[in-house]
Protein backbone atom coordinates (compact mmCIF):
# COMPACT_ATOMS: atom_id res chain seq x y z
CA UNK A 1 0.00 0.00 0.00
CA UNK A 2 1.29 3.44 -0.90
CA UNK A 3 0.24 6.20 1.50
CA UNK A 4 1.02 9.75 0.41
CA UNK A 5 1.28 12.36 3.17
CA UNK A 6 0.94 15.88 1.81
CA UNK A 7 0.17 19.39 2.94
CA UNK A 8 1.43 22.95 2.98
CA UNK A 9 4.99 23.42 4.26
CA UNK A 10 4.92 23.65 8.05
CA UNK A 11 1.98 21.31 8.75
CA UNK A 12 4.18 18.49 10.07
CA UNK A 13 4.45 16.15 7.07
CA UNK A 14 7.90 14.77 7.84
CA UNK A 15 7.30 14.19 11.54
CA UNK A 16 3.92 12.54 10.91
CA UNK A 17 5.15 10.51 7.90
CA UNK A 18 8.12 9.04 9.78
CA UNK A 19 5.99 8.14 12.79
CA UNK A 20 3.22 6.67 10.61
CA UNK A 21 5.72 4.56 8.64
CA UNK A 22 7.25 3.33 11.89
CA UNK A 23 3.85 2.37 13.38
CA UNK A 24 2.78 0.56 10.20
CA UNK A 25 6.16 -1.06 9.55
CA UNK A 26 6.28 0.67 6.14
CA UNK A 27 9.23 2.16 4.32
CA UNK A 28 9.54 5.95 4.67
CA UNK A 29 10.39 7.94 1.53
CA UNK A 30 11.11 11.67 1.49
CA UNK A 31 10.07 12.72 -2.02
CA UNK A 32 12.50 15.63 -2.25
CA UNK A 33 15.44 13.34 -1.43
CA UNK A 34 14.08 10.68 -3.78
CA UNK A 35 13.76 13.19 -6.65
CA UNK A 36 17.31 14.48 -6.08
CA UNK A 37 18.67 10.92 -5.93
CA UNK A 38 16.90 10.02 -9.20
CA UNK A 39 17.86 13.25 -10.95
CA UNK A 40 14.24 14.30 -11.34
CA UNK A 41 13.92 18.07 -11.48
CA UNK A 42 16.44 20.86 -11.31
CA UNK A 43 17.51 23.62 -8.97
CA UNK A 44 16.20 27.08 -9.91
CA UNK A 45 16.73 30.09 -7.64
CA UNK A 46 17.55 27.89 -4.62
CA UNK A 47 14.44 25.77 -5.14
CA UNK A 48 14.07 22.28 -6.55
CA UNK A 49 11.62 22.25 -9.45
CA UNK A 50 10.32 18.73 -9.92
CA UNK A 51 8.70 17.30 -13.05
CA UNK A 52 5.59 15.77 -11.47
CA UNK A 53 4.91 13.34 -14.34
CA UNK A 54 8.49 12.03 -14.22
CA UNK A 55 8.26 11.73 -10.41
CA UNK A 56 4.95 9.82 -10.61
CA UNK A 57 6.33 7.42 -13.22
CA UNK A 58 9.64 6.72 -11.45
CA UNK A 59 8.03 6.36 -8.02
CA UNK A 60 5.37 4.00 -9.39
CA UNK A 61 8.05 1.85 -11.00
CA UNK A 62 10.35 1.77 -7.95
CA UNK A 63 7.71 1.20 -5.27
CA UNK A 64 5.01 -0.82 -7.04
CA UNK A 65 3.64 -3.47 -4.68
CA UNK A 66 5.57 -2.12 -1.68
CA UNK A 67 4.32 -0.68 1.58
CA UNK A 68 5.47 2.93 1.61
CA UNK A 69 4.70 6.24 3.29
CA UNK A 70 5.67 9.00 0.84
CA UNK A 71 6.35 12.38 2.45
CA UNK A 72 6.21 15.60 0.46
CA UNK A 73 4.03 18.48 -0.63
CA UNK A 74 3.86 16.89 -4.10
CA UNK A 75 3.05 13.37 -2.89
CA UNK A 76 -0.64 13.77 -3.79
CA UNK A 77 0.43 13.65 -7.46
CA UNK A 78 1.66 10.04 -7.02
CA UNK A 79 -0.42 6.97 -7.77
CA UNK A 80 -1.22 6.33 -4.12
CA UNK A 81 -3.73 4.04 -2.46
CA UNK A 82 -4.46 6.70 0.14
CA UNK A 83 -3.62 10.40 0.37
CA UNK A 84 -3.45 12.04 3.78
CA UNK A 85 -3.74 15.84 3.54
CA UNK A 86 -2.40 17.39 6.73
CA UNK A 87 -3.80 20.79 7.64
CA UNK A 88 -2.82 23.37 10.27
CA UNK A 89 -4.00 26.80 11.31
CA UNK A 90 -2.43 29.25 8.82
CA UNK A 91 -1.16 31.42 11.68
CA UNK A 92 0.72 28.40 13.08
CA UNK A 93 2.15 27.70 9.63
CA UNK A 94 3.29 31.34 9.36
CA UNK A 95 5.07 31.09 12.71
CA UNK A 96 6.78 27.81 11.78
CA UNK A 97 7.91 29.07 8.38
CA UNK A 98 9.17 32.31 9.91
CA UNK A 99 11.29 30.20 12.30
CA UNK A 100 12.66 28.31 9.27
CA UNK A 101 13.78 31.59 7.73
CA UNK A 102 11.25 31.78 4.90
CA UNK A 103 11.16 35.15 3.14
CA UNK A 104 8.01 37.27 3.31
CA UNK A 105 6.84 36.37 -0.20
CA UNK A 106 7.30 32.59 0.18
CA UNK A 107 5.77 32.68 3.66
CA UNK A 108 2.72 34.58 2.37
CA UNK A 109 2.37 32.20 -0.56
CA UNK A 110 2.21 29.18 1.75
CA UNK A 111 -0.13 30.80 4.29
CA UNK A 112 -2.47 31.71 1.44
CA UNK A 113 -2.27 28.17 0.02
CA UNK A 114 -3.35 26.72 3.38
CA UNK A 115 -6.06 29.34 3.83
CA UNK A 116 -7.73 28.51 0.51
CA UNK A 117 -7.22 24.69 0.49
CA UNK A 118 -4.81 24.53 -2.49
CA UNK A 119 -3.27 21.14 -1.64
CA UNK A 120 -6.62 19.60 -0.67
CA UNK A 121 -8.16 20.67 -3.98
CA UNK A 122 -5.16 19.31 -5.94
CA UNK A 123 -5.33 16.03 -3.99
CA UNK A 124 -9.05 15.64 -4.76
CA UNK A 125 -8.42 16.33 -8.47
CA UNK A 126 -5.76 13.59 -8.58
CA UNK A 127 -7.12 10.92 -6.19
CA UNK A 128 -10.25 9.12 -5.04
CA UNK A 129 -9.07 8.21 -1.55
CA UNK A 130 -8.30 11.42 0.33
CA UNK A 131 -8.36 11.93 4.08
CA UNK A 132 -8.00 15.41 5.55
CA UNK A 133 -6.52 15.68 9.06
CA UNK A 134 -6.22 18.88 11.11
CA UNK A 135 -2.96 18.81 13.09
CA UNK A 136 -3.64 22.06 14.99
CA UNK A 137 -3.23 21.62 18.75
CA UNK A 138 -2.41 17.91 18.46
CA UNK A 139 0.80 16.04 19.19
CA UNK A 140 2.35 14.02 16.35
CA UNK A 141 1.33 10.86 18.22
CA UNK A 142 -2.30 12.03 18.38
CA UNK A 143 -2.32 12.82 14.66
CA UNK A 144 -0.86 9.41 13.76
CA UNK A 145 -3.35 7.65 16.04
CA UNK A 146 -6.20 9.51 14.30
CA UNK A 147 -4.86 8.42 10.89
CA UNK A 148 -4.43 4.81 12.04
CA UNK A 149 -7.99 4.75 13.42
CA UNK A 150 -9.35 6.04 10.10
CA UNK A 151 -7.35 3.41 8.18
CA UNK A 152 -8.51 0.61 10.53
CA UNK A 153 -12.13 1.70 10.05
CA UNK A 154 -11.68 1.54 6.28
CA UNK A 155 -12.30 5.26 5.74
CA UNK A 156 -11.27 6.16 2.20
CA UNK A 157 -12.51 9.74 2.02
CA UNK A 158 -12.90 12.43 4.67
CA UNK A 159 -12.71 16.02 3.56
CA UNK A 160 -14.28 19.35 4.45
CA UNK A 161 -13.31 19.22 8.13
CA UNK A 162 -11.29 22.45 8.02
CA UNK A 163 -12.50 26.01 7.48
CA UNK A 164 -9.92 28.72 8.03
CA UNK A 165 -12.23 31.63 7.13
CA UNK A 166 -12.47 32.57 10.82
CA UNK A 167 -8.71 33.16 11.07
CA UNK A 168 -8.46 35.29 7.93
CA UNK A 169 -8.04 38.55 9.88
CA UNK A 170 -5.30 36.99 12.03
CA UNK A 171 -3.22 35.93 9.02
CA UNK A 172 -3.85 39.04 6.94
CA UNK A 173 -0.42 40.51 7.85
CA UNK A 174 1.28 37.44 6.33
CA UNK A 175 -0.57 37.50 3.02
CA UNK A 176 0.86 38.94 -0.17
CA UNK A 177 -1.81 41.53 -0.97
UniProtKB/Swiss-Prot annotation:
One of the Pfam families matching this protein, by short name: AAA_18
Enzyme Commission number: 2.7.4.3
Catalysed reaction equations from the record: AMP + ATP = 2 ADP; ATP + H2O = ADP + phosphate + H(+)
Region (NMP): 30-50
Task of the protein: Broad-specificity nucleoside monophosphate (NMP) kinase that catalyzes the reversible transfer of the terminal phosphate group between nucleoside triphosphates and monophosphates. Also has ATPase activity. Involved in the late maturation steps of the 30S ribosomal particles, specifically 16S rRNA maturation. While NMP activity is not required for ribosome maturation, ATPase activity is. Associates transiently with small ribosomal subunit protein uS11. ATP hydrolysis breaks the interaction with uS11.
Lineage of origin: Archaea, Methanobacteriati, Methanobacteriota, Thermococci, Thermococcales
Keywords: ATP-binding, Kinase, Nucleotide-binding, Ribosome biogenesis, rRNA processing, Transferase
Cited NCBIfam families: PRK03839.1
InterPro entries documented for this protein: Adenyl_kinase_AK6 (IPR020618), P-loop_NTPase (IPR027417)
Family affiliation: Belongs to the adenylate kinase family. AK6 subfamily.
Source species, domain of life: Archaea
Residues covered by region (LID): 99-109
Subunit details: Interacts with uS11. Not a structural component of 40S pre-ribosomes, but transiently interacts with them by binding to uS11.
GO terms under biological process: ribosomal small subunit biogenesis; rRNA processing
PANTHER family, A to Z: ADENYLATE KINASE ISOENZYME 6, POS9-ACTIVATING FACTOR FAP7-RELATED
Residues that coordinate or bind ATP: 10, 12-15, 100, 138
Protein name as it appears in the record: Putative adenylate kinase
Molecular function terms from GO: adenylate kinase activity; ATP binding; ATP hydrolysis activity
Amino acid sequence: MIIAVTGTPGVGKTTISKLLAEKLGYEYVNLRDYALEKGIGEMKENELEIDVDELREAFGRDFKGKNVVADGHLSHFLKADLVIVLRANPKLIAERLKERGYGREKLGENVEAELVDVILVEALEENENVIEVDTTGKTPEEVVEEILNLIRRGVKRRVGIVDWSEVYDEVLPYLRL
